[in-house]
Curated annotation (Swiss-Prot):
One Gene Ontology cellular component annotation held by this UniProt entry: nucleus
UniProt entry tagged with the keyword Protein biosynthesis: no
Organism: Saccharomyces cerevisiae (strain YJM789)
Lineage of source species: Eukaryota, Fungi, Dikarya, Ascomycota, Saccharomycotina
Name of protein: Transcriptional regulatory protein EDS1
Main location: nucleus
Keywords: DNA-binding, Metal-binding, Nucleus, Transcription, Transcription regulation, Zinc
A family per Pfam: Zn_clus
């Protein structure tokens, strides 16, 4: 029986003899005159136009030459700009209408012989709407090209188009999979189901049930048993309107679909989802390619045994399988989780493929330490120490926990890939794109895949961590602390990604705090003499230094989670989830005083910048915990007379020369300005008439406002010079060639370390803007939002004061100096407006953050009443100022307007810097 299998491009390929007999009936386009004259009965073959003979839709629209590459499936123009190469446009009909009889005969012949219906080639990523699992760098060394990601649409009644030979494979459940539906619906409208008539034993089905498989050549040998049942194919659904929008540009409720999956839900999903095969872009391409190779080579249908599987993988270094299975009958909520049962099947994920994916992963890890670690150490340990933790062949690691180790490391790699690939800056023609693709030509497509599936990748990775949690907790005494450190570091990385993207929900932050509390991480800060019984630390570790080392590392992770919680509370105005008072935790646990082995960063300049940013997070934590909105019932005289005691956070005379120091000073001066403006309206239970010297009040307010405008201008200017897009820019700080070496796994020196090695001997070891060029900071979005709100509120004050001074006609020497200072502030406001327009990601993410008002309180002129003023309206009722002198009347009105600005500044501090409030 002849084999009829489509190739990668959807074109049916038949037996050579049958192809010769039926070439005319199939409507093939032949160049020879004899083939064009061939007829089947009385019907003439229809001539079809090849895609290579016409331009794609994008090139036709741009009126440029379309250089289509049949190997990659993408033309050169679409590949450079990152667009989808499509041929959706239907050419206009020319000449007389074609005879319908020939078309009907071709369709009839194709339906009788073709196992898959003919479909035009489409270049796009399959956006699965079902529950599938994200590809990982350890599983796929070279990401598929765009042409390889075409998933043919199959009718709902059709069987699976490949029979996977897993008869001799016996495996147990895995840890990092969750339940899903029995069919996988794709954006193309097709459903992939397992063949109900496959002669496969139940042991093999357990692997296919919830697995993610990257097939190899031998899988193509089993394609002869495939049959087609349906006669019509479902139409291709319309693609996403903007699939390449970076999730870090717009962060408005992006994770609406992300929800915390409890252990009970996971168990229920595992019971319902049975006999599934997860299809990824790699698996679709490999299946089609290898089926074609096996057909043309005449490969016999043979089964693949367990013993010979690893040898065959080693022969092909491009495609290697990664098995992920889950036993549906094993509930994750069971109290006693057997470690031996979970690790009975030992998939050597990292051990087998370490050499295979070492180059790519170490490159991703190097990008993190160069562009992210210097501003916020999501992995609170230096690179050399953390690289040793990833070694699966560490001593004291028994075989039973190897599977847990591999699953946790795999989740960490996936999370780090999402962070790096979604934040890397892609340009049409830049040296960075060429250097990035040195290791793999398809890294660009990989980044596009993570951007399109951003929400799903984050959700699946976190669900995998939740699935591992029961086993990790029940066997905490035998699992090394380094594995638990990687596990909790992955949770920090996932929360870091969402907050960096500007996500305005806490659907992941709340469960993450719950996981830390479940492992009693907060007890590490209590003065216990013996910390060995804790879940995070192991009592069976021999070295006491190791216990002390990991105790400090776990404290760092909890402090980092507290800072991430603080940033969400600062932006959204919501209560903090962690209210533990850590004291001076940054200087205690992150400085080089903790020891050389567990130091966060070995480079002095980078370490100085890390400590400054973390201290800024510590100050914002103190700032958030002292909000007055949480003290609504406080007496009104205490509301204004009690000043926030910043203690060690007192305002210094000299301004800092870095962004973190400037922003900290800006927040302090903002609190001082709020107190001054509110004291104008109410001061010692008396009203405005008792303000004996309004001119002095205006002078103090003017000087404070001008200094704040100068600080905002300096902050925005530093951000623009450092990284206006807050994305990884390989042009400003290119990676060294050592990252792309194929046979090197030794520790690599980052550009930061190479730069700072010469600066370490100098007296000034502080990090400058030049050292931070191209780096990514999680504090930039809150900084820009806060600066935007402050400028929107205090911007009219200099103009008002200048007009008041000129109207009074008092041109004394002191007044002239004030007018000059206010005029300089106005010039800086113009520069600030231009800087806001330069910050493209923040400008797209901007909305009316400064307008927090009740709709009922809005007047016809557009003015709105402060939310905090409405809350304290009964305590701040002003009386009639009947004894005010006429000459002072205008000044008093201006001061009252300034008091309203103080209330609105208080709204910004108390209710968050990016939220709008409506009634």
């Amino acid at each position: 029986m002849s084999h009829h299998v489509p190739n990668l491009y959807g074109t049916p390929i038949r037996d050579p003899h049958e192809r010769k007999r039926n070439s005319a009936s199939m409507g093939e386009v032949n160049q020879s005159v004899s083939s064009r004259n061939c007829e089947r009965g009385s019907e003439k073959g229809t001539k079809q136009r090849k895609k290579a003979s016409r331009a794609c839709d994008q090139c036709r629209r741009k009126r440029i030459k379309c250089r289509f590459d049949k190997h990659t499936g993408v033309c050169q123009g679409c590949l450079e700009v990152g667009e989808k190469c499509q041929f959706i446009r239907v050419p206009l009909k020319r000449g007389p209408a074609k005879k319908r009889a020939s078309v009907v005969s071709i369709e009839k012949f194709s339906s009788d012989n073709d196992p898959l219906q003919y479909r035009p080639r489409t270049h796009s990523y399959p956006m699965n709407s079902g529950n599938n699992y994200l590809p990982s760098l350890a599983r796929n060394s070279s990401f598929p090209s765009i042409s390889s990601l075409f998933v043919p649409s199959i009718t709902a009644q059709s069987q699976q188009f490949v029979k996977v030979p897993y008869d001799d494979i016996k495996r147990r459940s895995s840890l990092a999979t969750l339940g899903s539906d029995s069919s996988i619906s794709t954006e193309f409208g097709g459903n992939y189901r397992l063949d109900e008539n496959l002669n496969v034993r139940q042991e093999g089905k357990d692997i296919v049930a919830k697995g993610m498989i990257t097939p190899v050549e031998e899988m193509g040998a089993c394609s002869s048993n495939v049959r087609r049942q349906g006669s019509q194919s479902l139409p291709i659904q319309e693609q996403r309107a903007s699939p390449y929008i970076n999730p870090f540009i717009s962060g408005r409720s992006r994770l609406s679909s992300l929800s915390y999956t409890s252990e009970a839900t996971t168990s229920e999903g595992n019971t319902q989802g049975k006999n599934q095969c997860m299809l990824t872009p790699n698996s679709v391409r490999s299946i089609e390619k290898e089926r074609l190779n096996s057909l043309t080579a005449g490969c016999p249908n043979k089964k693949l045994g367990t013993d010979g599987r690893s040898d065959k993988w080693d022969k092909n270094s491009t495609w290697k399988p990664v098995y992920r299975s889950s036993n549906p009958s094993h509930p994750s909520t069971e109290k006693n989780v057997s470690l031996n049962q979970e690790a009975s099947a030992k998939p050597l994920m990292l051990g087998t493929y370490r050499q295979f994916d070492a180059t790519s992963f170490y490159k991703v890890l190097g990008i993190y330490y160069n562009f992210f670690h210097i501003n916020f150490p999501v992995i609170p340990i230096n690179k050399s120490k953390f690289t040793d933790m990833l070694d699966p062949e560490k001593p004291n690691v028994i075989d039973e926990i190897r599977q847990i180790n591999n699953e946790i490391i795999q989740c960490f790699k996936t999370a780090l890939e999402v962070l790096v690939f979604c934040k890397i800056k892609q340009r049409r023609s830049s040296k960075s794109t060429k250097s990035w693709s040195r290791d793999s030509l398809c890294d660009f497509q990989k980044g596009l895949y993570y951007i399109q599936n951003f929400n799903k990748c984050i959700a699946d990775c976190f669900q995998s961590l939740i699935t591992i949690k029961p086993v990790l907790k029940q066997n905490s005494s035998v699992i090394p602390s380094r594995i638990k450190f990687i596990y909790f570091s992955t949770i920090i990385v996932l929360n870091f990604i969402l907050i960096l993207a500007g996500e305005e929900s806490s659907l992941l932050l709340g469960p993450s705090v719950g996981v830390f509390n479940e492992f009693q991480a907060h007890k590490l800060f209590l003065p216990f003499e013996n910390t060995s019984p804790m879940l995070l630390l192991n009592s069976n570790e021999e070295s006491g230094d190791e216990i002390l080392d990991y105790a400090v590392l776990f404290k760092r992770l909890y402090i980092l989670l507290n800072i991430l919680d603080t940033l969400q509370s600062f932006r959204l105005g919501q209560p903090k989830l962690i209210n533990l008072n850590f004291g001076s935790a940054i200087e205690t646990y992150f400085s080089d005083k903790t020891g050389h082995n567990q130091v966060v960063e070995k480079a002095p300049v980078a370490l100085d910048n890390i400590l400054r940013n973390l201290k800024l997070g510590e100050f914002i934590t103190y700032f958030v915990l002292n909000r007055k909105s949480l003290q609504v019932n406080v007496p009104h005289h205490l509301l204004f007379t009690n000043q926030t005691d910043y203690g060690e956070f007192a305002v210094e005379k000299g301004e800092h020369d870095n962004i973190a120091g400037k922003f900290e000073t800006l927040l302090k001066k903002k609190e001082i300005l709020i107190r001054k403006l509110l004291n104008i309206e109410q001061k010692n239970d008396h009203i405005l008439e008792n303000c004996c010297n309004s001119d002095a009040e205006m002078k103090n307010i003017g000087e404070l406002v001008c200094s704040m405008i100068t600080l905002v201008s300096g902050i925005l200017d530093s951000i623009t010079n450092m990284n206006a897009e807050n994305s990884v820019d390989l042009d400003s700080k290119p990676l060294p060639n050592a990252y792309f070496a194929q046979d090197s796994e030794e520790e690599l020196m980052s550009p930061t370390q190479s730069i700072t090695s010469n600066l370490a001997s100098e007296e000034n070891t502080r990090c400058t803007t030049k050292d931070l060029m191209g780096t990514v900071s999680i504090f930039m979005l809150p900084m820009v939002e806060e600066c935007y709100n402050i400028i929107s509120l205090i911007g009219p004050i200099p103009t008002t004061l200048i007009s008041l001074y000129i109207r009074n006609g008092n041109m004394a020497k002191g007044i002239n100096d004030r007018i000059m200072t206010l005029s300089t502030a106005l010039n800086e406001l113009v520069q600030i407006t231009a800087l806001f327009n330069t910050l493209e990601p923040f400008r797209k993410n901007a909305h009316d953050r400064a307008k927090r008002y009740y709709v009922s309180a809005t007047s016809s002129t557009g003015c709105y009443e402060s939310v905090m003023k409405s809350m304290y309206s009964g305590k701040c009722a002003a009386s009639n100022a009947s004894n005010v002198a006429p000459s002072e009347e205008e000044n008093k009105k201006i001061l009252k307007k300034f008091a309203d600005i103080g209330w609105k500044l208080m709204d910004d501090s108390e209710l968050g810097c990016c939220c709008c409030f409506f009634n």
